[in-house]
Amino acid sequence: MHLYIAEKPSLARAIAAALPGPHEKGQGWIRCGKGPDAATVSWCIGHLLEPAEPARYNPAWKKWRIEDLPMFPEPWQLVPKDSVRLQFKVLEALVRKADLITHAGDPDREGQLLVDEVLRYLGTKAPVKRILINDLTPKAVARAIQNPRDNREFRPLSHSALARQRADWLYGINLTRFYTLSYQTRGEQGVFSVGRVQTPVLGLVVDRDNTIEHFQPKPWYRVEATFQASEPEADQRPFIARWLPGDEFQDHLDEENRLLDKSVAEQIVSAISGRPGRIDEARFRDRPEPPPLPLSLSALQIEAGRLYRMGAKDVLDTAQNLYERHQLITYPRSDSRYLPEEHFSQREAVIRAIARVAPDLSGFCEKTGTERRSAAWNDKKVDAHHAIIPTVRPTPNGKLSSAEQKIYDLISRFYLMQFAPDALHREGRLTVSVQEYRFRATETAVIEPGWKTLEIRKREPGQEPEKAPLPRLEKNEPVLCTDPQTNERKTQPPQHFTDATLLSAMTNIARFVADNELRKTLRETDGLGTEATRAAIIDTLFRRDYLFREKRFIRATDKGKSLIAALPESIRTPDRTAVWEATLEGVRRGEEDPRAFLESLKDEIRGFMAQAPAAGLANTETPGTAIHCPKCRAPMVEREGKFGAFFACTRYPACKGTRPLEDHQPEDGTSQKPVPCPHCFSPLVRRKSKKGWFWGCSNFPGCRQTVDDHNGRPAVDLRNST
């Protein structure tokens, strides 16, 4: 039997549709064709297996105890996930019957692993082929089916994903337990959830918030002067130029080359007023600008965040709908901005489809010449998947939502740009010497918009307008300085992060790294997280109540700030994590050993545990006596309200949890030290149902973990996990 294993049901249906009939549907499978050429298509539902919990390796590890740390499993174990156990059983039976298996996971790191791990777990001896499907339209799927590759070619990709999975387990579970237990011994409350990627991302937000909070504006001075040609036959148009600080003024400048000393500015103005000068440099040119490449997921999220203020997860979910439900775009979780050269032959069909699905772009589609070939088509730059582009499908499955239409239009615009002419900029520069000072004026103008007619323009704060044309003067021509001025300005704090700028920071993490050598290395890597995980990382920080939104800005909660303050710098900064991502990329390319990477990580975890945690939080409660919020488990304080005294959450207004005053310890367990959820590490909260007391995750409905109650404390055995 030939068995195809897809990553998800929607992909399985697309594969079945491309295989010959008749089709027979069963529970968790689709049979295609008859006789010896028949094939069966089944699917995973994301990861069917998950890393075993600590207690699976050692029953003593179920209880959180500092003496059991660090926990390094050997050998590693996977267990079927309860929520998808039925589909796992279906797939297990099919794999055991198969004499040929085709791996059809998504064309990325996780897509490779989630099918590979099932095959390894079941110990199949059948040969395994691999197909890469970036486009769910029938012709594209059929093309992929006809071009299978040996799955062994993708072993390094699978090793990279497996190393990432194990690194997350080692780092997250060990350090979360270590820092939680360390602070609880000091009377602190709550669970200190530490993640290999999420913690440095939170650190970026906390550092930005702290910078803004402690920012002290300082005055700085810009010296400008108006110049005009002295000779009557020369171009007499006046122009404004800015002073260029020389090396002798470095002591009066800040790190951004701004003048901080007003007396120096006044001295310059006095020295040049009415004085003759000379053109030192006159440069004018027309500069072509090629179109930007098609979009990767991060580029799409950044653009959509900037233009439409869409959150990273919203963009990903919308793109996933366009891919799976409507089949209007190619695989959305791509980190590539290049296209395979063979795809160039489909350009006319894609452009016709864009004109149908996005009527607002039909005029551009009609004018687009299809002979131009931008730098995007380059096989050498394409790996498992290519840039996100529209498919040849001309109609959606039903009406597109407003968000879906915006994302489709955005992807289409960047595709159409590949056939548009270069934009042409006219640039000019005049450098003037007057006395011992130098001034410079610049000119910028778009004289032929080219691909920019497809660009959605949105003026960014602080963006300077196009500069007026300069007079056409030549080197050594005399000029006269008139109306020199000193303009006082104030330094401005940076803005709080938005979805777009935080994603940009994660993809360009080298900007936030202090070490010069490390920064140079990181410029070659993808930064923190991957295309497929960045939105989920940000979402996790919101769900764990480390971040909150203030209009379009992302801010850190007090809980998030406390966590970062409590951790060593090497855990809360991006340096080490970004290096790990670079190492994982090396594993993917077959250049790094995943075992060496994990051994190095174990050494680092031992090093963290050898250091005493910093005192990040002030203990204001007597251990064991504090009342904690039933919603977020933060400490509560007594407040006076309209109807008398009550307990209120100290995190108000971010959390509006309250509880009445009681003469005894509350039955819901909020007077006890928080116990972490075994699934997501959020605090457990005691709740009452018709059958009696139980403990549920405070992160409900994001996490539905429940634990039995045993004499007012969470029991060891789990009652339910989904």
Place the predicted regions along the sequence by residue.
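Basic, low-complexity terminal or inter-domain segments flanking catalytic cores
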Residues: 2-3, 84, 121, 176, ...
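Metal- or metallocofactor-binding catalytic centers and their adjacent structured scaffolds
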Residues: 251-293, 575
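Intrinsically disordered, low-complexity regulatory segments
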Residues: 1-169, 173, 493
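C-terminal or mid-to-C-terminal helical accessory/interaction module adjacent to the motor/catalytic core
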Residues: 140-225, 285
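Glycine-centered, phosphate/nucleic-acid-interacting loop/turn motifs that mediate DNA/RNA or nucleotide
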Residues: 326-327, 545
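A conserved hydrophobic secondary-structure block that centers on an alpha-helix together
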Residues: 106, 307-311
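Structured, non-catalytic alpha/beta "coupling" segments that mediate domain-domain communication
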Residues: 27-57, 199-248, 416-468, 600, ...
